[in-house]
């Protein structure tokens, strides 16, 4: 375990590749692409606020060819959103074995997972205009709009949004953004393209 968190990387560098970009997170293209560490914080801008996030960082790798850019994003999350099980295979860590004297009675009915009020989600923000002014980090603003690629466990789909601040956004018509997601032993992995 590192004694300190890695330095957050800004900007993210995309590896140039020939041909199709694999959506397999174990493919060589992702092992060769530079990893960028991104620190995350609390969500204090809009209600309901989140003072104590369960996810504190994520890692991004990017690759591009002459047709598209793809992002491999992964993060550790101790609390799987059970909705994802409707859409893709999920591998959860088994509970640790307990000595007999710590075991309780088996429940009469199976335990139903609790569906969270807010599903797990991630959004990647791109500036619409490549001027020298960076857009506001949360959905840009009226003068500096952004394009968002957003994924959520509620649908396990990616959508594309044009945002002009916290209150102003519209779905991108003709969006071609796609996602392949995985959850394995406490780690979400996505390939957005």
Task: Show where each model-derived region lies.
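Structural preference for beta-rich elements and adjacent junctions enriched in aromatics
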Residues: 1-193
């Amino acid at each position: 375990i590192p004694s300190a968190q890695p330095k957050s990387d800004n900007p993210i560098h995309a590896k140039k590749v020939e041909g199709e970009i694999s959506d397999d997170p174990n493919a060589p293209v992702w092992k060769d692409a530079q990893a960028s560490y991104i620190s995350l914080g609390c969500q204090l801008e809009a209600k309901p606020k989140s003072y104590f996030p369960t996810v504190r960082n994520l890692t991004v790798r990017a690759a591009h060819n002459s047709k598209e850019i793809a992002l491999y994003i992964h993060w550790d999350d101790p609390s799987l959103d059970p909705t994802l099980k409707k859409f893709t295979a999920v591998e959860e860590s088994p509970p640790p074995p307990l000595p007999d004297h710590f075991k309780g009675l088996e429940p009469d009915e199976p335990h139903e997972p609790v569906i969270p009020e807010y599903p797990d989600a991630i959004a990647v923000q791109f500036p619409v205009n490549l001027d020298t002014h960076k857009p506001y980090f949360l959905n840009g603003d009226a003068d500096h709009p952004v394009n968002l690629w957003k994924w959520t466990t509620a649908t396990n789909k990616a959508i594309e949004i044009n945002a002009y601040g916290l209150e102003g956004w519209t779905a991108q018509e003709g969006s071609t953004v796609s996602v392949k997601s995985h959850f394995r032993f406490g780690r979400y992995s996505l390939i957005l393209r």
